Swiss-Prot record:
This is Uncharacterized protein aq_1127. Residues 62-90 are annotated as: Disordered. It comes from Aquifex aeolicus (strain VF5). Residues 68-89 have a biased composition (Basic and acidic residues). It comes from the Bacteria.
Length: 122
């Protein structure tokens, strides 16, 4: 089964994110946290909802997925080890690491090659 509605939302928000930040990809200029929060809110939140996970938290720096990085310094939000969290965290890591310094067109390939298989169920 393909979660078409969620994938459509994810795709639309991803394009918005790529348009917003242009061709420079992630830059180490002090705005990485802002950009990570933005991609979490606009791209990863729909993915997280597709897994029906319950650990999305509206922190000061925007939505983030617990378990990948301690965005609020609170250990009680640590990953509980469920497969849902692990899948989301692996995908988030691919987005953060895979989009550095690439064009929007290259980013689209990275993001969708990471996301699309997760929307299919055997």
């Amino acid at each position: 089964m393909c979660h078409e509605e969620v994938f459509s939302c994810c795709r639309t928000r991803t394009f918005h994110f790529l348009r917003s930040y242009g061709h420079d990809g992630w830059r180490n200029d002090g705005r990485n946290d802002e950009r990570k929060a933005d991609v979490s809110a606009h791209v990863l939140l729909p993915l997280h909802d597709a897994y029906d996970a319950d650990d999305v938290h509206d922190a000061d720096d925007g939505y983030a997925l617990h378990g990948y990085e301690p965005h609020d310094g609170n250990d009680e939000h640590a990953d509980d080890g469920s497969g849902n969290h692990e899948d989301c965290n692996r995908t988030q890591a691919k987005v953060y690491e895979g989009t550095y310094g690439k064009t929007p067109e290259e980013n689209e390939k990275v993001i969708f090659s990471s996301f699309f298989p997760l929307f299919l169920e055997e």
